[in-house]
Amino acid sequence: MYTIGWGKQQINIKAQGYAMFGYGQWSHRAHGEQTKLYARAVCIQDNQSNLSIICCLDMGCVTHAMRESACQQLHEQLGTVFNDSAFMLTATHTHSAPGGCSHEALYNMPTPGFVPKHLIAVTQAIVSSVMDAWQGLQPTDIHLGSDEFNADTPVAWNRSLAAYNRNPDVTQRTDQQRHLALDRRMNSLGFYRDGKLHALLSLFGVHATCIGNSLDKFDGDNKGYAAAQAESWLTTQGIDAPVAIFAQATAGDVSPHFHGKGALSRRNKIKGDAEYAYAQQNGNYQSDMALSMLSQPPQNIIKGKLDCILSYMNFSAMHVDAEFANGEQNAYTSDPCHGAAFFAGTPVDGLGTPAPIAKGMVLMAKTVKTWRLSGFNKNNPETTYYQRLYASQGPKNIVLEAGRKLILGRALDSPPSVFDPLIHEMNRQVKAGAIVDSPMVPSILPLQILIIGQLALLCCPGEFTTMAGQRLVNTIKPILQTRGIEQVLLCSYCNDYMGYVTTFEEYQEQAYEGGHTLYGQWTLAAFQTGFSHLAKQLIQPVELRVYDQNTRPEPVPAHELALRTNHGNVNTAVHTQ
């Protein structure tokens, strides 16, 4: 038996007209609150006083700034009992929550800019929820439940079927079978006292995009409604202050909206308040499933000690093990790049750039690539760099080189901004000198494994597609089985955010997810390489483990961050003199 506690704290951010994070739309601004947003935490301690902490936010993502700030305060509050390697911070990926919480430049651009009071509020909620959980530690049992949604439960659809069907290790699905082209299994940890369920942690992958970008209120979307529904039901059962965490698994290519013939027409019929109702229904499917499986006699009682490992790795130049790269001996990741498919968006969950402009981007990207690799540039010292970049990025039509801060081979402030306020804001920040040495997106990424008895949890940054996650689990499970691990689960959106992770085959399709897989076609292989190394260390006694414990993202230049810090102007983060 473990000693376990849980807590919940509201994220106190007032809607004041800033853009929300998720859709990347300048016009998607918050002017009200439909539901409250929360941080929910669980503290688990074993009989050797090892402490693991899981905290889930009703937010679009976790940023390094969030995690770093929370870790600093938790160290102060908990002292030596706090181990940042055993602290996992994740998010539900609702697209109707505040932005502006990152020190990197790109994902703050629509907000616009970095909003310190948002980061402070999120950090306060994290720390308060964790401290409530810590102070509530009591003897508690953990049961692992697992079940699949029936095929006729309209909870999720694959939104990138052509990419999914490229995988040789899947059952080929038709347009009418998109609801089967995903992992329909939910895994849930139930926390029991005196045989009664008091709290839970559910893992099921589906985008929190029931609510579109035309609404203007904060909302927890399907995962938030699932948590509220489960907590309400537990309260009716006499449980005091229950906590239900509905976190994400492989949500990358999974939509809560119908995909198939007539998908867009069907989506367009769900508008306004109907979107909130749709999100609530989707959440109810998830809460009903979790409560049903955890109300059954114990399927799998979790017992044993806690363990953990955390390491930050540079995904902009990572050599990939050949076994994960189709035998390729010289496979590398590269500087982060966004493709034309990223800017085009997804057809149902969130359209992006109009099709004619997206096609123009493709043409220009191909032209830039041809010129850079042509014989005319053979004496250019940059040629070697670009040969390696394009070898890594494969078929992606590169529009934004986030690493080198170029758009279609030109400076960031080169695109005309007269018709696009988002481009205008980027131009202003560039001209103000706010992004000279600051990263656009993260490249030093956290890989973490938590061990809870015979269960291992792979804590992954970003958004993994169904098969990318399945392959990662299949890679790590045989390694950890040698130390008695029976179940390996994956949680995504953990500890930082940098876009998507697709399989090599999915990447070749260059759908939205592949266009947003930043480090090239070997990105998944890099995760397999990195996680394999960490898993092998977990087999060793602690004193014999050899891995990088020191690398962390470099602090963003303070003077540049100040130049794009927003103190109340919803139109721009750049201060006018």
Each language-model region and where it sits:
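Non-catalytic substrate/cofactor recognition surfaces at enzyme active-site rims
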Residues: M1-Q577
